[in-house]
Amino acid sequence: MAALRSFLKKRSSVLCNGAMRRKLFSTEVSQPLTDSPSFAQRIRNLPKDLPGTQIKTQVSQLIGRTPIVYLNKVTEGCGAYIAVKQEMFQPTASIKDRPALSMINDAEEKGLITPGETILIEPTSGNMGISMAFMAAMRGYKMVLTMPSYTSLERRVCMRCFGADLILTDPTKGMGGTVKKAYDLLESTPNAYMLQQFSNPANTKVHFETTGPEIWEDTNGQVDIFVMGIGSGGTVSGVGQYLKSKNPNVQIYGVEPAESNVLNGGKPGPHSIMGNGVGFKPDILDLDMLERVIEVTSEDAVNMARQLALKEGLMVGISSGANTVAAMELAKKPENKGKLIVTVHPSFGERYLSSVLFQELRQEAENMQPVAVDYP
């Protein structure tokens, strides 16, 4: 410690010598960099497209082209290979950036919405709302979102961060109640428009045009099975339709919460797999294409999400855990030995810090006490 103090003292002495001393203690006020005429002029004259650069002109151009990676440790006992597309690398750390961009572009091209005039209203379970709020902020729309109150605090903060208005709905009414509230607002709000993620073909289209081709290209066309959780149904339908168009033998599976297994003939119910299990069949969901819809419990999804962080270094959300559980169920079947199964991790785990996923760790972190340090 004495040696450290001696070093710091010598370092301070060096910095304060000669011209450096005069500069540090000068009474002259330096002009801020951003206020200097040369800086401002340089920014104004900067071309949007500099030849030979890879600089994007706007953040929406960062959407897509996410990486895909094998799972290695959690797949012990599996006869098939499991590769996962990591949508956490999107601008808002979720796959919903894709359809949010697609649906807004589609509506603008059709003249249905106008920046600065149209108020966008949309029901969401979280990630789509964040992506829409992100796009609305970038394009200049006022955004109003309805969401069940059981969703995580991080979702609410993210939506508000992008300037969206947020209305929470009765958790016992599920997504059905959230959708109803959004339609009520639509009817009572002038110049309002709903992009309708659950019935908008542009939702499916973007996955047919981007997510599906990316998976096909990155697997060199060797994907045998694709499995995906069902929320709006856009991802599983769009990706499934594309993969089937390239190889009719590719098998497509959906995933839904066991506690809200509506697609398997059950009843809607509360669950922890945010983003999945909306409690009804979305219009854009192509059920006929699916081999079947695999049921995963909230408990299994949460436990798997935790294991993915601990064993694979992948901090992901609860629906990512559900997709992985379903993929592993298929990977353990003898008939799938040696096959390549692809699924998706839709979002980054940091968005779930206040949820059941990190409940114990959060409590542990909140109760941590500082230790004494002999310094200086």
Swiss-Prot record:
Q: Give the modified residues of type N6-(pyridoxal phosphate)lysine.
A: K96
Single Gene Ontology BP term?
Answer: response to wounding
Residues that, per the record, bind pyridoxal 5'-phosphate: N127, G231, S232, G233, G234, T235, S319
Extent of the transit peptide: 1-14
Residue ranges spanning the membrane: these are none
EC number assigned by the record: 4.4.1.9
Q: Determine the domain of life of the protein's source.
A: Eukaryota
GO MF terms listed in the record are: cysteine synthase activity; L-3-cyanoalanine synthase activity
Stimuli inducing this protein: Up-regulated by ethylene treatment and wounding.
**Tissue expression:** Expressed in leaves, flowers and fruits.
The protein's role, per its UniProt record: Probably involved in the detoxification of cyanide that arises from ethylen biosynthesis in ripening fruits. Has only background level of in vitro cysteine synthase activity.
Listed name of the protein = L-3-cyanoalanine synthase 1, mitochondrial
Organism of origin = Malus domestica
- Gene coding for it: CAS1
